[in-house]
């Protein structure tokens, strides 16, 4: 077992110990440890099963208890690359990013509006996550030195939460599968605790004036939260929705970070209500559905710090893992009445099972004290490659046109001299509206589409021509009749794909023909292609 028998009894019992042992390896395995140019450890988690993002804030936030427990080097390993990106000139928004790219490429946010717009971002969610995690590291180390490396970003995000956090606008949170929700009470709790964490960081840095200011704001927000979210014997899902409820898992930081912003009666009232509404296999995420998130149940179970309450919420989760008929790695999203997996396989978020251990300062100190790496002096973020457009995509040229058909053409459709007089003409950006990251200018809603266009290639020399493609789903590309590239699955933004040797050899100065076939099976769909020259960063 992962812990000695005395610790198992102390921290939550045998069922909890078995849950922790089951989660431990999966959490670490669902990501990659690497060394930076200075030999310091970095960690990149993968958002398995959903969109495959790398270094996602609202994935490493729920997984963080396992990393925090085992010391500063682990906890900082996933924050350093994220914070370096947030501090770069690539990130221009007043809130924290969502992700670093699509695994395994950490080359910039792809979720929602990416680096371009605020569409479908998670501004309160991500900003709160980072302030809380910085607060947790400071709590562990007894100083705010690590937070000081990124102080301008943390100040900016605290200002954002001060303005937007108490009563969040209609936006997504980490539970984005449930859709947008305005006036989210649990998200508000995250923002309030995040502001408290920032106040504590200010105090550790000796800025007592700012610390007092933010503690005052956090306490006032908490007072209003208690009043405005109250729904009798529990607290609401949304401030404007009486008769609703939700798990308030974000409140754990009020006690772990010793902020003491909320009365203990809040947790007690919530817990009594939770025990009255949970099902055979666990406590639903909120009143809207009967599904739950395993990681959040394990956080919620800790709120009163009472062993009986903890075991009351953990036992149904243990029962689910024993009785579910789904034979897959530990899922974190399942139905609480049927024990059926809804989705999410082998994700790192199950590291959240270890939240219970962060309440015991002696145990946390014991395991964190085993950190022998003492990571420091991380290398600067690598300079990104420069990209020069050779033939534009729809993003650069909204008026560019392609010839296209949705009827299977003759077998030589990709040859340079193929007759496309019977094909249609449409503006670049083919797909269905609502597809993530897509700028649709010509609707395509069938299973397949074939595209062709001519382009002129200036005289070289060209050292590193690559395909720039946004595809949903599988695509194959030909240049002057030669196979140039294939791209499986889907992306939510443009990616650069190396050209095959045959495609490179077929390119010539002057007139060229590019031909594309894209196949769609389910969900959104989109295809757009261009060529770029990549110059390596220094």
Regions found by a protein language model. Name each.
Residues 316, 331-385:
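Terminal, non-catalytic domain-edge segments
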Residues 16-36, 55, 93-94, 122-128, ...:
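Aromatic-lined, polymer-binding surfaces characteristic
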Residues 1-55, 76, 83-88, 369-397, ...:
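Acidic/polar, glycine-enriched structural segments that form the non-catalytic walls/loops
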Residues 423, 447, 455-481, 514:
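Aromatic-lined ligand-binding clefts that engage carbohydrates, nucleic acids, or primary amines
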């Amino acid at each position: 077992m992962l812990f000695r028998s005395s610790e198992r009894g102390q921290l939550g019992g045998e069922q909890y110990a078995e849950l922790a042992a089951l989660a431990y390896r999966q959490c670490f395995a669902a990501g990659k440890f690497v060394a930076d140019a200075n030999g310091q450890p970095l960690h990149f988690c993968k958002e398995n099963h959903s969109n495959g993002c790398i270094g996602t804030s609202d994935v490493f936030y729920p997984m963080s208890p396992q990393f925090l427990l085992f010391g500063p080097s682990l906890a900082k390993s996933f924050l350093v690359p994220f914070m370096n990106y947030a501090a770069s000139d690539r990130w221009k928004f007043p809130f924290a990013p969502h992700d670093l790219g699509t695994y395994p490429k950490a080359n910039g946010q792809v979720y929602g509006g990416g680096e371009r717009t605020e569409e479908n971002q998670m501004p309160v969610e991500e900003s709160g996550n980072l302030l809380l995690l910085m607060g947790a590291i400071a709590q562990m180390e007894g100083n705010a030195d690590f937070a000081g490396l990124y102080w301008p970003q943390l100040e900016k995000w605290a200002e954002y939460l001060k303005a937007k956090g108490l009563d969040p606008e209609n936006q997504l949170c980490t539970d984005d599968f449930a859709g947008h929700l305005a006036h989210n009470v649990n998200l508000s709790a995250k923002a309030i605790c995040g502001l408290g964490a920032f106040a504590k960081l200010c105090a550790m840095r000796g800025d007592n004036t700012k610390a007092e200011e933010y503690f005052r704001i956090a306490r006032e927000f908490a007072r209003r939260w208690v009043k405005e979210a109250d729904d009798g014997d529990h607290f609401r899902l949304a401030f404007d929705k009486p008769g609703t409820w939700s798990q308030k898992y974000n409140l754990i930081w009020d006690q772990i970070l010793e902020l003491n912003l909320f009365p203990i009666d809040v947790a007690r009232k919530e817990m009594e209500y939770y025990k009255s509404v949970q099902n055979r296999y666990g406590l639903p995420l909120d009143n809207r559905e009967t599904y739950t998130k395993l990681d959040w149940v394990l956080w919620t179970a800790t709120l009163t710090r009472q062993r009986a309450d903890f075991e009351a919420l953990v036992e149904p989760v243990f029962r689910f893992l024993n009785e579910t008929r789904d034979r897959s790695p530990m899922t974190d999203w399942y139905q609480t009445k049927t024990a059926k997996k809804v989705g999410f396989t082998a994700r790192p978020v199950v590291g959240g099972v270890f939240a219970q251990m962060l309440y015991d300062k002696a145990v946390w100190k014991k395991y964190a004290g085993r950190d022998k790496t003492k990571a420091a002096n991380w290398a600067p973020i690598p300079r990104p490659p420069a990209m020069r457009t050779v033939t534009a995509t729809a993003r650069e040229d909204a008026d560019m046109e392609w010839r296209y058909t949705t009827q299977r053409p003759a077998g030589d459709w990709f040859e340079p001299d193929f007759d496309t007089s019977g094909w249609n003409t449409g503006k670049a950006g083919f797909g269905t509206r609502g597809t993530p990251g897509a700028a649709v200018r010509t609707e395509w809603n069938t299973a397949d589409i074939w595209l062709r266009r001519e382009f002129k290639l200036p005289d070289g020399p060209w050292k590193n021509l690559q395909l720039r493609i946004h595809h949903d789903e599988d695509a194959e590309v030909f240049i002057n009749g030669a196979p140039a590239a294939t791209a499986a699955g889907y992306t939510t933004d443009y990616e650069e794909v190396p050209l095959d040797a045959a495609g490179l050899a077929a390119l010539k100065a002057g007139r060229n023909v590019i031909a594309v076939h894209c196949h769609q099976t389910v969900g959104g769909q989109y295809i757009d292609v261009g060529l770029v020259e990549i110059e390596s960063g220094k």
